């Protein structure tokens, strides 16, 4: 059938499995009633699509000092990135830091993300999952364009310092990271997250 010009294609939506979530809470010991932020620092195509780990670590330390739970999510391939972030957090501040990287299935990630007050992510698969469970998220873009791969949610916010599709070329990388992502400073991200937390949606 031919769709009408004003037909709106519904955005993806994912359902939570309460029984599985209950098992995850018991297994990992995090509290869904406490404020929590999920950090999704990985990206399929390596560092050119990732916000620098040193910047993620600054955000993690800020929220731990505010007594938030910080949950790091990703696949086994993201373990080195997650560990690099963990290593920048002092031992005494790690009580509320939960590193789920490589320990959960995609279905588990759906359930865990659904409990979070905020999600900070690169342009990645977990960004789209967070959007589909309708939680407040902040997505950081570098070489890719949110015009083509946006998080489909009214609760999503985006920061991008470059416009359009920015190919990763020689001279446009800083320590392996795309210059557009390197330009996004932790202070700006923290301010955006704080404002987003207070948004009435």
Outline where the language-model segments fall.
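Mid-sequence helix-capping/hinge segment at a functional interface
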Residues: 1-48, 86
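CheY-like receiver
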Residues: 24-28, 59, 112, 192
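Short secondary-structure boundary segments
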Residues: 41, 123-124, 142-143, 162-163
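Glycine/Thr-rich phosphate-binding loops of Rossmann-like dinucleotide-binding domains
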Residues: 47-48, 80, 129, 148
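Donor-binding and catalytic core of enzymes assembling or modifying cell-surface/extracellular glycoconjugates
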Residues: 53-142
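Gly/Pro- and small hydrophobic-enriched strand-loop and loop-to-helix capping segments
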Residues: 133-161
């Amino acid at each position: 059938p031919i769709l009408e010009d004003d037909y709106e294609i519904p955005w993806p939506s994912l359902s939570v499995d309460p029984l599985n979530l209950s098992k995850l809470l018991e297994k990992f010991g995090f509290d869904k009633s406490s404020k929590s932020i999920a950090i999704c620092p990985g990206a399929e195509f390596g560092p050119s699509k990732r916000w620098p780990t040193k910047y993620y670590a600054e955000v993690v330390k800020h929220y731990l000092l505010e007594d938030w739970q910080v949950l790091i999510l990703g696949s086994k391939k993201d373990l080195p990135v997650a560990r690099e972030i963990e290593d920048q957090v002092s031992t005494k501040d790690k009580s509320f830091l939960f590193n789920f990287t490589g320990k959960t299935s995609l279905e588990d990630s759906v359930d865990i993300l659904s409990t979070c007050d905020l999600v900070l992510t690169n342009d990645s698969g977990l960004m789209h999952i967070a959007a589909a469970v309708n939680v407040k998220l902040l997505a950081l873009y570098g070489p890719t364009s949110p015009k083509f791969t946006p998080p489909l949610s009214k609760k999503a916010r985006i920061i991008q310092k470059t416009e359009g599709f920015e190919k990763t070329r020689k001279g446009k990388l800083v320590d392996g990271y795309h210059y557009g992502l390197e330009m996004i400073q932790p202070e700006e991200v923290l301010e955006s997250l704080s404002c987003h937390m207070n948004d009435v949606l």
